[in-house]
């Protein structure tokens, strides 16, 4: 509600503000915001977040010397976010250094199985009913990242290197609305059938090493109007932090991000974001599948594939596999620019179209055993129908999922961007005999920044 009131005040200011030249910001600049949202499964989110920018004498504006982002919030049914991020282009001469320390206490999070369309999605099971939450599990993540970047000569190319430590705690969902005596979930089903081995069923610790190259000709990183950005990097984790497992969870992955921006007149920018992230070698644990590794972290949560940080309008983490392809396309249309409370403001909207799919499956052979090696039995009921273990492997190969939507952005000094985005999935599974395969209704995101 506070965000909506603030937005209304900004809209009112637009009506009375005269056209003024953008001022060059100097020194410290603060962007506080209440963290408020609602989820039927998680409850109300309450807390606060703050962006701090240091512009120095203003000669680098709209770029910054350094920034800090912090957030502390909690949901009424138990989930919590504690986040601190630092990014500096001046702390060490010739280097860009960023650090992230975050705790995501996801005592209730979505789990829809592996390999997209291969895993049955039942809309009536996608909620807590009578103490049962079939598509829920727990996934806490304590994360620390340290990244360094440097230029290669005077070219637009650069190198990037970093480490990322993640400590995952997984298990059955913890939620006040669940009946702990009778609740049975898809996560439990996967553990019982060995699709998720017991040795990784409760989480683990991993130290990822990142190394790659970057190409960047954008005129501005956070709010570009033109240019190209390419990121290509390897990241992997040797499994030496998880004791004596009977097998190893070493893995090596490749991520490639391509971003392109074209100006279409003075007020419209077309942006495209094409991504591949996939396994090259090894055996990634199930709890790491939804971890999307960025170089420069624009959002606290970058999990996928699905939901607001990767594939808007779909159910969160709907697509999980060994390798993904996805793309985001949008038109960023500036509605108004004005000065208010000695800050540079802009209002923008961004109609968007997203698509993605699993291109290399994960533990598909094990999924085929659902209801086969053990006596098939009902594991869930919804809409007057019983669903058996064997129902949750459809035998389908994943195909392209699509969504579209619209956003409204309130941007201060070209960096602090309050985002309201609404998306709808188009993948209804009509060919497969069920509807709303990626979630029903309108997905909503209230947060910071464009997603790319």
Task: Give the positions of each predicted feature.
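Short loop/turn motifs that connect adjacent beta-strands in outer-membrane beta-barrel proteins
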Residues: 20-28, 56-65, 91-97, 153-159, ...
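Outer-membrane beta-barrel initiation region
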Residues: 20-98, 180-182, 186-225, 339, ...
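Residues that define the transmembrane beta-barrel architecture of outer-membrane proteins
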Residues: 28-30, 42-46, 50, 64-66, ...
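Transmembrane beta-barrel strands of outer-membrane/channel proteins
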Residues: 36-38, 48-52, 68-74, 84-86, ...
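Outer-membrane beta-barrel translocator/channel fold
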Residues: 59, 72-144, 272-305, 431, ...
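Transmembrane beta-strand segments of outer-membrane beta-barrel domains in Gram-negative
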Residues: 100-102, 109-265, 269
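C-terminal outer-membrane beta-barrel translocator/porin domains of Gram-negative envelope proteins
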Residues: 222-343, 359-361, 366-368, 373-382, ...
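Outer-membrane beta-barrel "beta-signal"
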Residues: 410, 438-452
């Amino acid at each position: 509600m506070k965000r909506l009131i603030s937005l209304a005040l900004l809209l009112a200011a637009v009506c009375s503000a005269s056209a003024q030249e953008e001022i060059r910001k100097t020194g410290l600049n603060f962007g506080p915001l209440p963290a408020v949202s609602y989820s039927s499964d998680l409850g109300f989110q309450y807390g606060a977040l703050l962006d701090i920018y240091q512009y120095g004498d203003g000669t680098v504006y709209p770029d910054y010397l350094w920034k800090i982002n912090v957030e502390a919030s909690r949901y009424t049914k138990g989930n919590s976010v504690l986040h601190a991020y630092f990014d500096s282009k001046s702390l060490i001469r010739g280097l860009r250094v960023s650090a992230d320390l975050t705790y995501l206490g996801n005592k209730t999070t979505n789990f829809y199985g592996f390999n997209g369309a291969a895993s049955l999605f039942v809309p009536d099971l996608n909620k807590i009913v009578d103490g049962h939450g079939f598509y829920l599990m727990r996934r806490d993540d304590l994360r620390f990242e340290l990244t360094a970047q440097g230029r290669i000569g005077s070219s637009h190319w650069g190198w990037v290197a970093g480490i990322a430590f993640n400590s995952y705690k997984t298990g059955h969902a913890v939620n006040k609305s669940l009946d702990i005596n009778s609740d049975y979930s898809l996560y439990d089903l996967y553990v019982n059938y060995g699709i998720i081995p017991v040795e990784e069923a409760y989480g683990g610790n991993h130290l990822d090493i990142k190394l790659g190259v970057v190409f960047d000709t954008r005129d501005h990183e956070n709010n570009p109007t033109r240019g190209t950005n390419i990121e290509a990097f390897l990241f992997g984790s040797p499994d030496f932090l998880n004791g004596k497992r009977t097998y190893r969870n070493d893995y090596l992955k490749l991520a490639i991000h391509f971003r392109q921006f074209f100006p279409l007149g003075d007020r419209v920018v077309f942006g495209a974001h094409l991504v591949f992230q996939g396994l090259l070698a090894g055996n990634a644990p199930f709890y790491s599948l939804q971890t999307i590794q960025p170089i420069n972290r624009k959002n606290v949560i970058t999990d996928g594939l699905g939901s607001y940080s990767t594939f808007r309008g779909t159910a969160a983490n709907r697509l999980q596999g060994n390798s993904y392809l996805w793309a985001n396309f949008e038109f960023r249309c500036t509605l108004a620019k004005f000065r208010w409370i000695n800050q540079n403001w802009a209002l923008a909207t961004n109609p968007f179209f997203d698509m993605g799919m699993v291109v290399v499956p994960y533990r598909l052979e094990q999924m085929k055993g659902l209801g086969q090696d053990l006596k098939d039995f009902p594991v869930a009921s919804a809409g007057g129908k019983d669903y058996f273990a064997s129902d949750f492997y459809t035998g389908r190969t994943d195909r392209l999922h699509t969504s579209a939507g619209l956003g409204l952005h309130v941007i201060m000094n070209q960096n602090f961007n309050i985002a309201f985005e609404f998306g709808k999935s188009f993948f209804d599974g009509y060919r497969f005999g069920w509807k709303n395969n990626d979630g029903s209704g309108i997905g909503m995101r209230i947060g910071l920044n464009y997603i790319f």
